[in-house]
Structures are given as structure tokens and as C-alpha cells.
């Protein structure tokens, strides 16, 4: 594993993005490059075992931390994201900088995104989506609060209307680790995410026509793995996320715990080592299936509102 520090702009003094690269193992050239887009508040360390396993299957894999999170925060010499200037648009630029770096490292091979939750939402803001050959989304959906899973929905309005504004104002960032909610986040990130999650059309509704046009530029195929016992997302939320990508060939594949003879998978489970012999190989099947998604399926997932 090799660690690199990037900046999204390349300019001196720009925020650090710490990237870890796992080179494909074995004598054969890498089959493809994979960039794992992390979920909100999740450090890249969480994906390390899965990334190493993918490298063992012949893929070059990149993981990273958005600015103000994990190793990227450590690179700033800070112990909290207080004062870190970042929002979700900046995070999309960070993500795309990692994609560009991965493309340059392996220019002749396909490049796929494996987006966990937020990691499947932000590619709609890429300035150059043509760099990407496909996206497998994992446990991802619209974050609109009415699309949340039933148990989460019971408390989420308190979270957005009381806890987030109050805690962020008091601390100068969102102290999610202390509150056991999401994770520590820069103020600009959590407050923009709040706007998205309170809008029925999520990011596109909150950001307007420019965001809608940006998502419409995405032409790469999207295959969504929808976890049926996800404690945060719902199938409707997944459908609504895919509806934001109107010109992308797309498909939803549900995964239930019974499919792999376990009691629970949940929002984070697919990346845990207990599924190395079951769900991890399924992700490779999903990556290979991207090329088979016909363009005729694009924009065929109708948006829903409630």
C-alpha cells in the first residue's frame, strides 16, 4: 500500500487529500482501476481490508479521505475539523482529484467507482465524468429525510432542526464522534447536507439547475446494490438517487441477508471481512455487469416523492 497526498486544485496551500493505493497483485497487469468513494463520516481505514482483497483479485484500488476527515485531517495537523473550509461540492472535487490520479496511474485500463452511500451521490458533481467507466453503488440512496428507513425517520427531524444547528454553532464543526452520530464533519459539509436532506429532490433540489445539469452529464452506467435490511436507506431512496442520473444506464440489484445465509448485513456490512467469501466476490460480478447495462434503461427509474 502506498500513501500519496493530493490537492483537488493542485495549488500550493490547497487542502490535503490523503490517498492510499493498493496495487494489483500477481504478474498480470491490473484488470481495472477502482476508486472507493467513502460514506459520510467514514474514514478510509474502514475500507482497507476490502481494498486489499480487491488488489489480490487483480485490481488497482484507491481509497481516500475527504478534506477535513481522517488522514486528510491529520495531514493538516489538526485534531478536529473546526475551521476547515469545506462543503460537499469541495468533497466532490476531492473525489474527482482521486479519480484523475487513478486514471493517470493506469491510463489504459477501465476505471470504476465503488461508491458507498455518499460515495455514489457525489459523482453527479464531477466536472469530467467521462473519466469514469461505471459506478457500483453500495447502500446508497437519496438522503431526503422521507426516504430514510422507518426507525431513522422517527428521529431525523430532531437531528436536522435541533441537534445539527445547535452543535455546529457551539463547536464550530459537527462533533459527530462525541454524539455518536455520523462522525466529526466540517461545518460547511454538515450544513449543506442538511439542506439536501430537507429537500424532496435532495442535492438537485437544493442546488438548483446547475446541479441538475451536472447529473445529466453522467453517461457511465450505474449498478446499485440495495441492502434490504439497511438501517438508514430504503429501496425508494435508492430509486430516487438513480433518478438524479437521468442519462445513465442503470439497474438496481437487491441484496438480502438470506441471500448469504446471515441474519444481518446493514448499511456498513458489505465491507466487513465476514463477507470476504460471499458479498465481496459479488461486487466483482457487479463491476463486470456494468458493461452489460443497455443505454435503453437510462432514465427508466421514475422519481418518487412522499
Name what the model sees in each region.
Residues 253-306:
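Catalytic active-site module of serine/aspartate enzymes centered on a nucleophile-bearing elbow/loop
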Residues 44-80:
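Conserved alpha/beta-hydrolase
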Residues 233-244:
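Short alpha-helix in the alpha/beta-hydrolase fold that links the catalytic acid
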Residues 36-42:
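Active-site glycine-rich loops that stabilize anionic/oxyanionic intermediates
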